[in-house]
Amino acid sequence: MLAKSLQKGDTIGIIAPSKPFNQDRKFELDNFIEYMKNQGIKVKISKNFYASDKYGFSAGTPEQRAKDINTMFSDKNIKAIWCLQGGEPANQTLDLIDFENVKKNPKLFMGKSDIDVLLLALNKKTDLITFHCCDTKIGSNKELDFDYTKKWFQKRLFEKSKIIEPSEEWVCINQGQTEGKILGCNPISILKLAGTEYFPDFSNSIMFLETYKSNPTELIVQLTHFKQLGVFEKIKGIVIGNNFEFQSDKFKAENIVNEFLEEYNFPILKINEFGHYQPHAFLPIGAKVKLDATNKSIEIMDDFLN
């Protein structure tokens, strides 16, 4: 199921389904809204955007956050839904999302980190292609600050370009070519769905993985969990993204993945265009891609927007 591409004059709805908005960082959101305005895009903030639960843990109750998701999908004037940021509690909204409403009103749905929970669940329940991308922030050189990200915001979401372009040189970790649908990206977020109806079907997929302030022990535990879930029996290859502040002077995340999965002999490619705090390629979650780890290329094969 495909959403419509963006056009000048469209309205983006911004929601906060995970961590609460921080007033001290308001300038980042203001800069983002101003940038969208300069691109001919209007912005609407959801009703419960500024809410916070009593623990200060989430941007309102699960009901408030789910209502904002459902309302944005119902709103005929909203063409895309972009999540403010990640955090921890996005999975609290899953049982409250009206997936039939989503099917009737397919829209661009975007975010990263804890928002991968929603990207994957929406794709699993409705087949909607969702997008792993930066937060709705400009001003700290972390999100929509990069020229590359601004370029691919336009080329992916307006022009529907199927190219995934390196922002710096990619590294072949294990040679090979394969095809499969993109599923990922943050292992903590993916594993929140384990044992639920929202867990992705990894059959014939390429697993995109990135970590945030992780370490070798944590990564090996997560890879073991995926192995016990049977994920590696289903996937066709792996693309490793940015591993922000990976806590090891001796080991790289991509080499740990390669060694752990040596028995499968997957094509594995290391890139830096998805994850935390670097340029973003706006990955279409659920779309089929051709991965050539040997020649260091990725090509989107499916249409991902109407």
Residue ranges of model-derived segments:
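ATP/NTP phosphate-donor binding region
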Residues: 1-77
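Buried hydrophobic positions in well-ordered alpha/beta secondary-structure cores of metabolic enzymes
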Residues: 14, 81, 114, 190, ...
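Charged helix-capping and loop-helix junction motifs
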Residues: 28-31, 63-64, 221-226, 251-258
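Short internal beta-strands
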Residues: 44-47, 111, 235-242, 269
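Active-site histidine-anchored catalytic micro-motif
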Residues: 58-173, 181
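Structural motif
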Residues: 82, 110, 206-208, 239
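ATP/pyrophosphate-binding catalytic subdomain of soluble kinases
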Residues: 149-223
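ATP/nucleoside-binding phosphotransfer catalytic cores, i.e., glycine-rich phosphate-binding loops
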Residues: 242-306
